[in-house]
Amino acid sequence: MKDEVALLATVTLLGVLLQAYFSLQVIRARRAHRVSPPLTTGPPEFERVYRAQVNCSEYFPLFLATLWVAGVYFHEGAAALCGLVYLFTRLRYFWGYARSAQLRLAPLYASARALWLLLALATLGLLAHFLPAAARAALLRLLRALLRTA
């Protein structure tokens, strides 16, 4: 059992560490710009770091759910790879947003694509799980044919 989910567990732990890093950056920005809790407004430099962290936290549960469902029901390696891409693009998003609101956009779109791909993999995996064996085999043949033409 453990071997079947080791990649998913690793990506999950990396995601948790990334969330911790984002939180530490908010603490650092609070100190640098003298914004005491519970305030969430201050200089634009602080607000960008704060908003980047909050946005990443808001999407983290969606990421975890799609990562695990895609990994268990579709393919662990594919889900883990998409998960790593998602985490890397969220890190780039955070760094970009901390510098300027405009620099957040390209990584934001890239992370959205990775999340949509995880959702698609999770959906396909669950669909295949609930289909009868004959329909599942036909779906797999169709997917292989589509991948060859792509």
UniProtKB/Swiss-Prot annotation:
The active site is at residues 31, 104. The keyword tRNA-binding does not apply. GO terms for cellular component: endoplasmic reticulum membrane; nuclear membrane; nuclear outer membrane. PROSITE patterns: FLAP_GST2_LTC4S. Gene3D superfamilies: Membrane associated eicosanoid/glutathione metabolism-like domain. GO terms for molecular function: enzyme activator activity; glutathione peroxidase activity; glutathione transferase activity; leukotriene-C4 synthase activity. It holds the Pfam family MAPEG. It is found in: Nucleus outer membrane; Endoplasmic reticulum membrane; Nucleus membrane. Residues 1-6, 70-73, 125-150 are cytoplasmic. One of its GO terms (biological process) is leukotriene metabolic process. Inhibited by MK886. PANTHER family: LEUKOTRIENE C4 SYNTHASE, MICROSOMAL GLUTATHIONE S-TRANSFERASE. Catalyzes the conjugation of leukotriene A4 with reduced glutathione (GSH) to form leukotriene C4 with high specificity. Can also catalyze the transfer of a glutathionyl group from glutathione (GSH) to 13(S),14(S)-epoxy-docosahexaenoic acid to form maresin conjugate in tissue regeneration 1 (MCTR1), a bioactive lipid mediator that possess potent anti-inflammatory and proresolving actions. This is Leukotriene C4 synthase. It comes from Cavia porcellus (Guinea pig).
